[in-house]
Design a protein with these regions (language model features):
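Accessory nucleic acid-recognition modules appended to NTPase machines
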Residues: 1-72, 76-80
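Surface-exposed, flexible loop/turn segments at secondary-structure boundaries
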Residues: 20, 69, 83, 93, ...
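Generic hydrophobic alpha-helical scaffold/packing signal
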Residues: 51, 55, 76, 87-89, ...
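Short catalytic-loop micro-motif centered on adjacent basic/acidic residues
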Residues: 63, 85-88
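Structural motif
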Residues: 82-84, 112
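Catalytic cores of nucleic-acid endonucleases
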Residues: 90-131
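Domain-level recognition of nuclease-like catalytic cores that cleave nucleotide substrates
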Residues: 120-158
Length: 158
């Protein structure tokens, strides 16, 4: 992924999501603490939280945004055989961009994707869904998943 890396195009994340919350205005902080209302910050908070967990597992953070398009992925990770888009959904989104990336002939290295949301663990249309709190288990899933899939389908069919 480093070969396509553009050092002048990047996203910034806090190493500690608590620091991100501390930068909110006082009213938003109080609303968040008292009412658990994440409001307009929900997407940024969850994306930062997942990014923080990915870094702690040793992943480098890469994202994708196609020019003049809404096609994007919050993060990308790599396994031995595949490039995996990782989406973070603040709401119960359908991960339209991820489905496009998985099914498009333009991206042959993308065979499946991972979505983090408030939903339970699930699998549909080559998208594996996990609750946010399972982010810290991603590396373990990836190691077990790749070995299982390779045994079942063979390296070329992943």
């Amino acid at each position: 992924m480093g070969g396509n890396y553009e050092p002048d195009t990047f996203k910034l994340y806090f190493a500690d999501t608590g620091l991100l919350v501390s930068m909110l205005d006082d009213e938003s902080q109080e609303d968040l603490r008292a009412n658990k209302n994440l409001g307009v910050y929900k997407g940024a908070l969850y994306e930062n939280m997942v990014g923080e967990a990915l870094i702690k597992q040793g992943y480098k953070l890469f994202y994708y945004k196609k020019e003049n398009s809404t096609l994007e992925a919050d993060f990308f990770i790599r396994s031995a055989a595949s490039l995996i888009p990782v989406e973070v959904k603040a709401k119960s989104g359908r991960a339209k961009s991820m489905k496009t990336l998985i099914t498009s002939d333009h991206y042959p290295d993308i065979r499946y994707g991972i979505k983090f949301s408030k939903n339970n663990i699930g699998h549909e249309d080559r998208i594996y869904t996990f609750p946010y709190f399972c982010t810290f288990l991603l590396k373990r899933f990836m190691l077990g998943f790749h070995a299982e899939e390779e045994a079942e389908y063979g390296e070329g069919d992943l």
